[in-house]
Regions:
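Short, conserved secondary-structure transition motifs
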Residues: 175-180, 203-220
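Extended, regular secondary-structure scaffolds
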Residues: 62, 165, 177-205
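Conserved phosphate/anionic-ligand binding catalytic regions in large, soluble enzymes, centered on
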Residues: 36-53
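Active-site-proximal helix-loop elements at catalytic-domain edges
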Residues: 3-18, 211-216
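Single conserved hydrophobic/aromatic residue that forms the stacking wall/gate
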Residues: 1-2, 223-235
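Low-complexity, serine/threonine/proline-enriched polar segments
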Residues: 67-127
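Short secondary-structure boundary/capping segments
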Residues: 51-59, 184-192, 217-222
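Histidine-anchored nucleotide/phosphate-binding helix
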Residues: 59, 147-162
Length: 235
């Protein structure tokens, strides 16, 4: 793959009048096959929070710094992040963790204690998102429940990977995160099994680091070390 896919360039748009036919075709065909939802989930959330880490480690709260902070109104600025903090799915979780430490999130915002708040988001002091797989970060807020991406894959599997009452999923994960994924599965699987009248069959595997390969862009510059897929399966 040399560039991202877009509509009509690697991605096909299905006409509305064909949707029901294709859905019916899949649902009938899937009952005659062994369907499994396979999800690459080994990515860490560290890169997602790179800007937050940088700010936490460098911001001192001096007058000149704060002036630059409030003047930067770009969508991905730290000012906008804190201004809209209450809109993030992890907001309630963050408030509760801080409250357990007898810390009031709103008061800390009022006192401009930005790096302290980030410590509760990124480190073991609080949510520890700096050492959390992306699949386990709070992702979608529902009326009485916050789902992670991992949860959403379970829901999707119940909706389109079910044969009889069983839905099969396989996740590739980083070895150090296996216990955390299994803990999350134990916590939410019964909820979704009851909600969707399904029984989950979930397996995990680990990609061996020795299979990592180098990726480059069109300028022959190194992008990352990742890619294909010889996997070590675990229960």
């Amino acid at each position: 793959m040399y560039k991202r896919q877009t509509l009509n360039n690697g991605i096909k748009s299905v006409p509305t009048e064909e949707e029901n036919y294709l859905i019916d075709l899949y649902e009938k065909g899937s009952q005659k096959a062994d369907v499994i939802k396979m999800v690459p989930a080994s990515g860490s959330a560290t890169r997602m929070f790179k800007k937050l880490f940088t700010f936490m480690e460098t911001y001192k709260g001096e007058a000149e710094e704060f002036l630059k902070f409030v003047q930067d109104k770009s969508p991905d600025s730290m000012h906008e992040f804190f201004l809209h903090l209450n809109e993030f799915p992890f907001y309630t979780h963050l408030k509760n963790v801080m409250w357990n430490d007898e810390q009031d999130l709103q008061k800390m915002l009022d006192k401009r204690m930005f790096t302290n708040i980030l410590a509760y988001i990124l480190t073991e002091k609080g949510l520890n998102y700096g050492d959390t797989p992306k699949g386990l970060v709070d992702f979608h807020v529902y009326r009485d429940f916050v789902r992670t991406p991992f949860d959403e894959h379970l829901v999707e599997a119940a909706l389109y990977c079910k044969k009889g009452r069983e839905a099969h999923l396989h996740f590739t994960v980083s070895e150090e995160y296996v216990p955390r994924f299994k803990d999350r599965l134990a916590k939410v699987s019964k909820v979704f099994e009851k909600m969707f009248n399904v029984k989950y069959k979930v397996t995990f595997s680990i990609q061996k680091p020795s299979t990592d390969t180098v990726s480059i862009d069109e300028n022959l510059s190194l992008i990352h070390i990742s890619e294909p897929t010889r996997l070590r399966c675990i229960s």
